[in-house]
């Protein structure tokens, strides 16, 4: 009888054969059946991730079949916060790109986003990140600022793109484009841009927390949490706050940080 420790090793390293799996199903030892159950659950999860990856790659593949060469995903983060920039990323992935589990950055943990961002940046054909400041958001409004950040990111690419995949927006640029509702959960290129933009902006807000202690920018990234609203009432607005966003003026009562 094969020791349970040996079975565990074979299951973990993937060296077990179909015949061996069939034999394990007949093994009545509780430890073996528990190992087998976990293994099967992992295999099912892996297959789910593979299918999701294929599904999220279909837009890029269809565009390549139509003759487009450099399909670029574009996404933004930071439209809703009361402070900080709106940040966009444009990303072109290679044809053989594979990163199982990649999806909308909002669905990933901070640790996963950091891990994936490193892998994406290493594998990408090209990517570019751009931001528009809170002051400029106040001048031109958040929608126009978002589009400007996206356009800046596209223009910053080291390789020219011939088709854009966008998340529920259209840009006034002379490039063919496809807009997808909830695109960051439907396209790998958009998801990759979502992750890169999110990680970059979060790091920016963490640095901002050192400049303006007491606001908690490193925890809420500028969103209107209860603690952030309280900080506005206590300390007032910083230059990084969006004065055109009603809660900023209402909660700060016009108080300026440091005065």
From Swiss-Prot:
Any single GO BP term: DNA replication, removal of RNA primer
Record-level GO cellular component terms: cytoplasm; ribonuclease H2 complex
Annotated cofactor note: Manganese or magnesium. Binds 1 divalent metal ion per monomer in the absence of substrate. May bind a second metal ion after substrate binding.
Pfam families named among the record's database cross-references: RNase_HII (PF01351)
Key words, A-Z: Cytoplasm, Endonuclease, Hydrolase, Manganese, Metal-binding, Nuclease
Domain of life: Bacteria
Annotated compartments: Cytoplasm
InterPro entries: RNase_HII, RNase_HII/HIII, RNase_HII/HIII_dom, RNaseH-like_sf, RNaseH_sf
E.C. numbers: 3.1.26.4
Function: Endonuclease that specifically degrades the RNA of RNA-DNA hybrids.
Family, per entry: Belongs to the RNase HII family.
Protein name: Ribonuclease HII
Annotated organism of origin: Shouchella clausii (strain KSM-K16) (Alkalihalobacillus clausii)
């Amino acid at each position: 009888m094969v020791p349970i420790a040996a079975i565990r090793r074979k299951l973990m390293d993937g060296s077990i054969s179909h015949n061996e799996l069939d034999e394990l199903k007949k093994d009545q030892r509780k430890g073996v059946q528990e190992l087998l159950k976990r293994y099967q659950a992992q295999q099912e999860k892996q297959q789910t991730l593979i299918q999701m990856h294929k599904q999220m790659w279909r837009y890029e593949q269809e565009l390549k079949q139509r003759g487009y060469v450099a399909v670029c995903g574009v996404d933004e983060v930071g439209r809703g916060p009361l402070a900080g920039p709106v940040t966009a990323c444009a990303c072109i992935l290679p044809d053989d790109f594979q990163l199982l589990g990649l999806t909308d950055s909002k669905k990933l943990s901070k640790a996963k986003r950091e891990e994936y961002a490193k892998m994406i940046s290493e594998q990408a054909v090209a990517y570019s990140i751009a931001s528009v400041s809170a002051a400029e958001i106040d001048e031109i409004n958040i929608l126009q600022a978002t589009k400007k950040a996206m356009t800046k990111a596209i223009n910053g690419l080291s390789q020219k793109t011939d088709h854009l995949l966008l998340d529920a927006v259209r840009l006034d640029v002379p490039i063919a484009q496809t807009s997808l509702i909830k695109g960051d959960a439907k396209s790998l290129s958009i998801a990759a841009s979502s992750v890169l933009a999110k990680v970059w902006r979060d790091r920016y807000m963490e640095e901002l927390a050192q400049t303006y202690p007491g606001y908690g920018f490193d925890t809420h990234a500028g969103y209107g949490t209860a603690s952030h609203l309280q900080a506005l009432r206590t300390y007032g607005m910083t230059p990084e706050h969006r004065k055109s966003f009603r809660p900023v003026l209402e909660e700060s009562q016009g108080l300026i940080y440091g005065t």
